[in-house]
Amino acid sequence: MKLCVIAGARSAFLTKSLVKSTRDIRVDHIVLLDNDQQKLKTYGEISRELSRRLDPDLTFEVTSDARAALTGVDYIITTIRAGGDAGRLFDEQTCLAHGVLGQETTGAGGFAMAIRSVPTLVYYCTLAREVANPGHLIFNFTNPSGIITQALRSKGFDNVYG
């Protein structure tokens, strides 16, 4: 089975955990999809090397091509940060300037993050609906995960869990 991590070139720790679990979850192909070319190059190569060392039989790819990454996929994990670190910083500083908590999972900061993230994730979910294997599952870890998961399910993506 094929697994794609959207915004996957940002955490070698996630890659390590996934690669170590591939036999248990019956995954033989992992794709890290990311639109940040620098992170894709740096962390993607670290992740590729981790994969090679931990499970040389695993097919492992890094790419910025969403269509290729999602074609034939069975599982998708989302971990995007729409707006990047600059967006998070802006949200948190704006909230603090107005005397409210600005962290990304609750409150005004989380709501701002959701507003930026939902359209991007709708795009990926729509593309996956077109090119992924029937019955594919999407596991949302994009914060604020509850708000985003509910928004995607409200848009008809009943295969999203988070």
Residue ranges of model-derived segments:
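Conserved N-terminal Rossmann-fold NAD(P) cofactor-binding segment
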Residues: Q37-G72, T79, A86-R88
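Residues at the starts of beta-strands that form the adenosine-phosphate
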Residues: K2, D28-H29, T59, L137, ...
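N-terminal Rossmann-like dinucleotide-binding module
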Residues: M1-I30
